[in-house]
Structure formats: structure tokens, C-alpha cells
Curated annotation (Swiss-Prot):
NCBIfam families: murG. UDP-N-acetyl-alpha-D-glucosamine binds at T15, G16, G17, N125, R168, S196, Q297. The keyword Glycosyltransferase applies. Cell wall formation. Catalyzes the transfer of a GlcNAc subunit on undecaprenyl-pyrophosphoryl-MurNAc-pentapeptide (lipid intermediate I) to form undecaprenyl-pyrophosphoryl-MurNAc-(pentapeptide)GlcNAc (lipid intermediate II). GO terms for molecular function: UDP-N-acetyl-D-glucosamine:N-acetylmuramoyl-L-alanyl-D-glutamyl-meso-2,6-diaminopimelyl-D-alanyl-D-alanine-diphosphoundecaprenol 4-beta-N-acetylglucosaminlytransferase activity; undecaprenyldiphospho-muramoylpentapeptide beta-N-acetylglucosaminyltransferase activity. It is an enzyme of class 2 (transferase). Keywords: Cell cycle, Cell division, Cell inner membrane, Cell membrane, Cell shape, Cell wall biogenesis/degradation, Glycosyltransferase, Membrane, Peptidoglycan synthesis, Transferase. It comes from Novosphingobium aromaticivorans (strain ATCC 700278 / DSM 12444 / CCUG 56034 / CIP 105152 / NBRC 16084 / F199). It is a peripheral membrane protein. Disulfide bonds: none annotated. This is UDP-N-acetylglucosamine--N-acetylmuramyl-(pentapeptide) pyrophosphoryl-undecaprenol N-acetylglucosamine transferase.
Amino acid sequence: MTTVSRHYVLAAGGTGGHLIPAFALAVELDRRGHHVALVTDERGAKIPGKPDFLPAHVLPAGRLGKNPVALFKGLRAIWQGRAMALRLFESFEPSCVIGFGGYPALPALLAAHAARIPTVIHEQNAVLGRVNRLLAKRVDAIATAYGEVDRLDPKLWGKVHRVGNPVRPDVLALRGEPFPEFTEDSLFRVLVTGGSQGASILSEVVPDGLAMLPPALRHRLQVTQQCRPEDLEVVRARYAAHEIPAELGTYFEDMQARLAGTHLFIGRAGASTIAELTAVGRPAILVPLPIATDDHQAANTREVVAAGGARAIRQSGFTPKELAKQIQAMAQHPHTLANAAHAAWNCGLPNAVKDLADLVESFGASPIMDVIRLDSTVSAASGQEQLA
């Protein structure tokens, strides 16, 4: 724990995947007595879950397009964002700038490098993202969620720290809860989500796949499924036709409570999703998003699948028959599902936010406690304010 209060800037792209771990770190740094500010884009400033104490500064940020016009526009926006970030740093005086990926993080990190402010990047996925690849050689430390990170230059291993993906405190609080009782006579609770926007492929496949289960499993089903608004009535009709009780919605406020009571999760393989599943210890059938950059969702599944805590099905092979086959293999015998839950739990890194905060605190003014390098063998394989 530090003995001085410092200022930190978190820079993150405007999606939940980048911002959820940033919000978690903000809460931890605030708890330790520090002042924290967020730099993001207009989307990011509106993402639900931002702590009330955290001001969000909106900076221009452009993508580096392939055609000359798009490239010029992107570079101009990045340069403008860099200049605005430098003005913010003059008044806020951060001890460190922490990037969580996404193009909106780029201007602030470039500004920090120019101002000789220490920088840390956090990679949520098992593939180093584009912006983090651009910055990896320049930053002072690279925090990773996985022990194997593709597209990470082996020459940079010396500044890599495996910390994991920070998860929300309300989810982390479930880590000590036992896996829900699952016997040959109990309910079989299945939770299905497709990320922040739902996933139509899950709406198309899951109801029919569950209907193909043996009667001993099918008759015990209790399903909760997140759907896109346009899919709700069609999915409702499918479950009704199969006589499977299902609660459907576009968003569930009490998702952590539903996760606590779940026996099996079916959904995408985003980094935050897997971090929460392994923090709580819930077995899963994961369907990686096929258009994810660098196929990073498929890479995210490697560790938990190898451990026996989940099964992965490529979307091209995600059929009702294949889903039913995989569910039956996991849940036909109660001990099999319980073993998978334990394997998932063992993959969790519950101290991720603490370890990331310790790493961040190792840069800037002293005295502070030494940060422990967690894994030196990582392999390469709204308080919104518009800056003037």
C-alpha cells in the first residue's frame, strides 16, 4: 500500500471489453487513496458501470484506415487527441498512464511517452491487440491476462507481468460460493448470453440444441437467455414449442446473481466473460466470435478448455446436434459438471485488480511497496468532461 496520494490516467477504447477492467482498476486505485481520470471516446464515456467518482475526458481518436484519405483523417484525429492529452497532463500531473487497448487509448499513451510519463498497457486477450502492439516497445510494463499471448515480441518478455483480467467486485464476491447443487433430480440451470449486443446465432441454435437433450436432462432445464430485441419473440416461440421453461430478456440487471445459480454457461468467449466464469467457477460452452480481430476469442478459450473447465465450438460447427452432444458430455453425470466447474475455478486469477494496481503503483513517486513479478515466462505464441 502506498503512503502518498497520486494521480493516474486510464486510457481505454469505447467498448465494454476495454472499459470493464479499467473501471475495476479505477475503483481499486480510488480505494487506495489515489485520484483517477479516464480518457476515452464518446462511446466509452456512455458505457454503463463507470464509477461516479471517475471523470471521463473525451479525446479525438481515429482508426488508421488503409486508404490514404482514411489514414490521413485517422492520423489527424490521433494528433489532435495527443495535444489535448498533453494539456490534461499539465494540470492533472499523472504518475502513470495506463492503457487498456482500443484506438481511443492511443493519443493519451503517445502523449505520455512524449512527456516522459511512465506507461503501462494491459492486454485483456490472448492475442496482443493492434494498439498495444504499436506501443509495446515504448511502454514501461505490459500486463497480461494469459500465460500465452500471441503476437507478443519475445524480446519484450522482460517487462511482461501476468496479472489476469480484473472483474467486478460483485462477481468476485461469488468466488467463495460453492457450485450449485447438481444431482440427477435437481434443476439444470443454463445461462445463455451473447455479449453486450446478444448474438443471433445463439438464438437460432440453443433452443433446438437443448430440445435434443435426453429427457432426463431436458425435463430439468431452466433457461435464462439474453437476446437481441428483434429475436425475442422468435426465441420465445421456439422454447414454448419445445416446452422448455425459459426467461428471456435483452438485459438482466442482476446478472451476477444469475451467474451464481448457473450450472452451465453458453456464450461468446470475450476476455471479460471468461474472467468472470473462471473467477466464480462455472463450466461453459464457448462459441468464439468468428470476426473478432486476429481471432482472439478462439485464443482466449485455450487455457480454460485445456484445463477441462470449458468446451469450445467454432461458429461454423455450432449446430443444435453438436451443442446437444457437448452438453450431454458435460452434464450427463453430476460429477462431470462439478469437475468442470472446479477446473474453471482453478483457472481464475482473483487478485488481478490488486496485482495490476500494485504494478501501476511501482511507477512514480516513492515510497511504495515492491511489485512482485507474477510470471516472467509469459510466452509470445457520468462525470464526462469535453476537453477544450
